[in-house]
């Protein structure tokens, strides 16, 4: 299925506010818009990805996730999903994204991710730590990063273009206020729904079928979405833009959640 032609899901009328291949295919839904902060999917988006993944863990994987999380009582996959943004630093900032040359969405590690310093490399690195015999502390840290980075790579503009820093420098107007395209995709489209992460996760749950994937595949998918004619609006986010891209945004959230579950089940469910 073309991930730019995902059938919309009707929301309730009350809606307001390692080289391993993992699996999943495209899916789902509809949404509206309002611009906000710039930090990957924002809190709500990362929580949705984590909650969708949590619901799809196998018993063995869940037991190992719970064992790792027990080092910090009260933590869940959802609560750790934003840890990497809350503890962000200049050193780790490049691990949240990968930038492509405009017009070329074929991932080349040497060009796009030197020394593994991008979100694709970071996913592989953290997955390797999680699968290793490292200390429980190191594996919990890897889990925190992995939950977050898998969400990041499914936000299209976290695999955007060098020349505008993934849409951060592309200024526009959205709902009578200044913003940038990266912020629109990070949080704006989700925030305008005024749905909790629980409610949005319920809307997205159970709509995907497994299919092979890798972090490289996810990054190239995101880049191709950004490369779609019309993805960059003419400095104004219009209702027609929202109508065209709202299913894409929620489809990426759903893909991120399902793919994260597949990855965790593969690593921890053995």
Language-model features, listed with the residues they occupy:
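N-terminal, motif-rich segments that launch catalysis or mediate targeting to/interaction with membranes
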Residues: 39-149, 156-270
């Amino acid at each position: 299925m073309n991930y730019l032609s995902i059938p919309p899901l009707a929301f309730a009328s009350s809606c307001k506010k390692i080289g391993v291949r993992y699996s999943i295919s495209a899916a789902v839904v509809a949404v509206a818009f309002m611009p906000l902060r710039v930090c990957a999917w924002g809190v709500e988006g990362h929580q949705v990805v984590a909650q969708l993944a949590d619901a799809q863990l196998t018993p063995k994987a869940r037991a190992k996730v719970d064992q790792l999380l027990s080092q910090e009582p009260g933590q869940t996959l959802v609560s750790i999903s934003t840890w990497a943004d809350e503890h962000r630093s200049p050193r780790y900032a490049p691990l949240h994204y990968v930038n492509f040359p405009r017009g070329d969405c074929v991932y080349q590690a040497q060009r796009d991710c030197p020394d593994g310093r991008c979100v694709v490399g970071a996913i592989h690195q953290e997955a390797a730590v999680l699968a290793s015999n490292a200390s429980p502390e190191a594996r919990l840290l890897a889990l925190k990063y992995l939950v977050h980075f898998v969400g990041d790579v499914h936000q299209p503009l976290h695999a955007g273009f060098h020349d505008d820093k993934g849409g951060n420098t592309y200024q526009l107007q959205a709902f009578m206020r200044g913003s940038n395209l990266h912020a629109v995709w990070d949080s704006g489209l989700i925030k305008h729904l005024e749905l909790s992460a629980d409610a949005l996760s319920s809307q997205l749950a159970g709509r995907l079928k497994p299919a092979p994937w890798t972090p490289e595949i996810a990054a190239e998918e995101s880049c191709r979405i950004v490369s779609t004619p019309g993805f960059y609006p003419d400095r104004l986010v219009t209702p027609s833009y929202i109508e065209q891209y709202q299913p894409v945004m929620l489809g990426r959230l759903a893909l991120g959640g399902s793919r994260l579950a597949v990855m965790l089940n593969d690593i921890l469910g053995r």
